[in-house]
């Protein structure tokens, strides 16, 4: 979402995501893993104020970020792929926890690409190609809402948006490394989920809570809890009365699913 605020700058909203389903099907020859997942954006979001400028890249943030952050990579890859020469000033107000599995960094990158695409009139197909070069989850965030995601994350099939749900979040304050979590997987852990992602999507649309509980899955949850058993204590009283409680992404955040008016963060539709 882009909102012009004058003085040549714009304000971007960058939503977090949940993995309502996430399984790893195997390791590819390019060292990435083949995944299948049901992704969903929620109302928790970061805010970016951006301005095209002369010169280089400038970033102010309320949290520490690595020098090779996703926002800078998005700017670099956009310039490389389009041939456009411009500088960029970004002020980031981050609310999505870093290392939580909620996709904050990927969402930030997608917000930048979407904004630059509007400024320089770049088609969505080209933006998706650039997004895949920035990070595996970035293409999904160009759509938002509900989507079936495959490949290493770059194959995004937009689905009918799921409405009428909200979540509460539990973040144990642990930065979970996506790379480390993937390295922790062994071949016998592949393809262990129910595999019926379209059926899970339909269960959400039909409010079939029993089937939602039955088909929800995250391959990383067991691995994460084995690495961090202390998190179980924090989860004991989290999600009481929820439809389902599970981890998102490669951790470390967990979500508890509720009907729309009972959780803090409603599901958000896509573009």
UniProtKB/Swiss-Prot annotation:
Signal sequence range: none
Q: Which UniProt keywords apply?
A: ATP-binding, Isoprene biosynthesis, Kinase, Nucleotide-binding, Transferase
The UniProt catalytic activity note for this protein reads: 4-CDP-2-C-methyl-D-erythritol + ATP = 4-CDP-2-C-methyl-D-erythritol 2-phosphate + ADP + H(+)
Q: Write out the catalytic residues in the record.
A: 17, 137
Q: What is its EC number?
A: 2.7.1.148
Give a yes or no for keyword Nucleus in this entry.
no
Metabolic or biological pathway: Isoprenoid biosynthesis; isopentenyl diphosphate biosynthesis via DXP pathway; isopentenyl diphosphate from 1-deoxy-D-xylulose 5-phosphate: step 3/6
Gene Ontology biological process: isopentenyl diphosphate biosynthetic process, methylerythritol 4-phosphate pathway; terpenoid biosynthetic process
Q: A single Gene Ontology molecular function, please? A: 4-(cytidine 5'-diphospho)-2-C-methyl-D-erythritol kinase activity
> Record's InterPro entries?
GHMP_kinase_C_sf, GHMP_kinase_N_dom, IspE, Ribosomal_Su5_D2-typ_SF, Ribsml_uS5_D2-typ_fold_subgr
- Listed binding positions for ATP are 97-107
Q: What does this protein do?
A: Catalyzes the phosphorylation of the position 2 hydroxy group of 4-diphosphocytidyl-2C-methyl-D-erythritol.
Regarding protein family, the annotation reads: Belongs to the GHMP kinase family. IspE subfamily.
Alphabetical list of PANTHER family matching this protein? 4-DIPHOSPHOCYTIDYL-2-C-METHYL-D-ERYTHRITOL KINASE, CHLOROPLASTIC
Its protein name is: 4-diphosphocytidyl-2-C-methyl-D-erythritol kinase
Q: What is the lineage of its organism?
A: Bacteria, Thermotogati, Thermotogota, Thermotogae, Thermotogales
């Amino acid at each position: 979402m882009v909102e012009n605020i004058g003085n040549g700058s714009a304000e971007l909203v960058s939503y977090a995501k949940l993995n309502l389903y996430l399984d790893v099907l195997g390791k590819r020859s390019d060292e990435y893993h083949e995944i299948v997942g049901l992704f969903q954006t929620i109302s928790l979001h970061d805010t970016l104020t951006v301005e095209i400028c002369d010169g280089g890249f400038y970033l102010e943030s309320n949290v520490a970020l690595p020098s090779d952050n996703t926002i800078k990579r998005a700017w670099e890859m956009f310039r490389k792929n389009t041939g456009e020469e411009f500088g960029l000033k970004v002020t980031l107000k981050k609310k999505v926890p870093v290392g939580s599995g909620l996709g904050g960094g990927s969402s930030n990158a997608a917000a930048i690409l979407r904004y630059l695409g509007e400024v320089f009139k770049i088609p969505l197909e080209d933006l998706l190609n650039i997004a895949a070069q920035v990070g595996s989850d970035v293409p999904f965030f160009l759509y938002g809402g509900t989507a079936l995601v495959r490949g290493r994350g770059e194959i995004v099939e937009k689905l009918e948006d799921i409405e009428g749900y909200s979540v509460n979040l539990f973040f144990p304050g642990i930065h979970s490394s996506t790379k480390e979590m993937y390295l922790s997987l062994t071949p016998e852990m592949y393809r262990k989920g129910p595999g019926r992602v379209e059926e899970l999507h339909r269960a959400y649309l039909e409010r079939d809570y029993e089937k939602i509980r039955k088909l929800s899955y995250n391959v990383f949850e067991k691995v994460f809890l084995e690495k961090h058993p202390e998190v179980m204590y924090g989860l004991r009283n989290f999600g009481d009365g929820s439809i389902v409680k599970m981890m998102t992404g490669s951790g470390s955040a967990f979500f508890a699913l509720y009907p729309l008016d009972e959780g803090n963060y409603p599901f958000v539709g896509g573009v």
